[in-house]
From Swiss-Prot:
It comes from the Eukaryota. Its main location: secreted. This is Teretoxin Tan6.2. One of its GO terms (cellular component) is extracellular region. The lineage of its organism: Eukaryota, Metazoa, Spiralia, Lophotrochozoa, Mollusca.
């Protein structure tokens, strides 16, 4: 009985150790992933008022980000992310 208890404890500890080495459960939250179409439509209206680019009806184009615009889903803390995101200068 004592051997099976020790074996169980070793298995639990190894499971915790190797489980913590795996991929993180929560992925990095990117601004734009959780916006609804109402927010996107509001942005499109604001950009349309300024004469800039208008966002597609689905919201797959560019959004205002800080001083300019950037690809939808790439704006974080009023800055466009660098990797895999196109940046556009404001007009």
């Amino acid at each position: 009985m004592a051997t099976s208890g020790r074996l169980l404890c070793v298995c639990l500890v190894l499971g915790l150790v190797f489980g913590s080495l795996g991929y993180p459960v929560m992925e990095k939250k990117r601004a734009g992933k959780n916006f609804d179409l109402g927010t996107i439509a509001n942005w499109a209206w604001q950009i349309g008022e300024k004469g800039g680019e208008i966002i597609d009806a689905i919201g797959t184009s560019n959004v205002p980000c800080g001083d300019g615009t950037c690809q939808f889903g790439c704006c974080e803390d009023d800055r466009c992310e660098d990797l895999g995101c196109d940046t556009f200068s404001s007009s």
